């Protein structure tokens, strides 16, 4: 299985990079995983609704350019469906069963995802009703993908 994580913004925090690299290494036994970092759109602090839409649309264009037509897209969004780790594992397992060998997870920037990206998404996933920094979500997502593969293989994992 090929898994891409398309995300806005560069990861600067060393501790997050180390955590992500550790889970990518662990995941290499199960799947090929790539993280595609795209530049965030520079914007002042106090944006109007129209300016926010413009920023999200520009970031959205960059995201969509990195999504191949044959991939199953899962957008991380607060309004998405919440799943347990077992349900995420089941989603990944079913996609593999039905011949979907490519999954792309999308993490937006600080303003979220554009309407165009949300329309392209095959499903929307929420980890919580709380808002998390998009940099931290990368680590949480990679850990949950690793956990999903462990669950699907019947291997032990921490509950």
Swiss-Prot record:
GO terms for cellular component: cytoplasm. Keywords: Cytoplasm, Methyltransferase, rRNA processing, S-adenosyl-L-methionine, Transferase. GO terms for molecular function: rRNA (pseudouridine-N3-)-methyltransferase activity. SUPFAM superfamilies: alpha/beta knot (SSF75217). It catalyses: pseudouridine(1915) in 23S rRNA + S-adenosyl-L-methionine = N(3)-methylpseudouridine(1915) in 23S rRNA + S-adenosyl-L-homocysteine + H(+). S-adenosyl-L-methionine binds at residues 76, 108, 127-132. Coiled coil: none annotated. InterPro entries: Alpha/beta_knot_MTases, RlmH-like, tRNA_m1G_MTases_N. Disulfide bonds: none annotated. It is found in: Cytoplasm. It comes from the Bacteria. The keyword Cytoplasm applies. Homodimer. HAMAP family: 23SrRNA_methyltr_H (MF_00658). This is Ribosomal RNA large subunit methyltransferase H. It comes from Bacillus velezensis (strain DSM 23117 / BGSC 10A6 / LMG 26770 / FZB42).
């Amino acid at each position: 299985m090929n898994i891409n994580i398309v995300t806005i913004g560069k990861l600067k925090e060393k501790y997050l990079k180390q955590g992500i690299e550790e889970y990518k290494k662990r995941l290499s036994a199960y799947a090929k995983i790539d993280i595609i970092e795209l530049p965030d759109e520079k914007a002042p602090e106090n944006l109007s609704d129209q300016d926010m839409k413009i920023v999200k649309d520009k970031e959205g264009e960059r995201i969509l350019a990195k999504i191949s037509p044959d991939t199953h897209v899962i957008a991380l969004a607060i309004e998405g469906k919440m799943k347990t780790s077992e349900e995420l594992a089941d989603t990944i397992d079913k996609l593999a069963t039905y011949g979907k060998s490519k999954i792309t997870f999308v993490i937006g920037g600080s303003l979220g995802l554009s309407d165009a990206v949300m329309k392209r998404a095959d499903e929307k996933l929420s980890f919580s009703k709380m808002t998390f920094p998009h940099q931290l979500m990368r680590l949480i997502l990679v850990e949950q993908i690793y956990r999903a593969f462990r669950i699907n293989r019947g291997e032990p994992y921490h509950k």
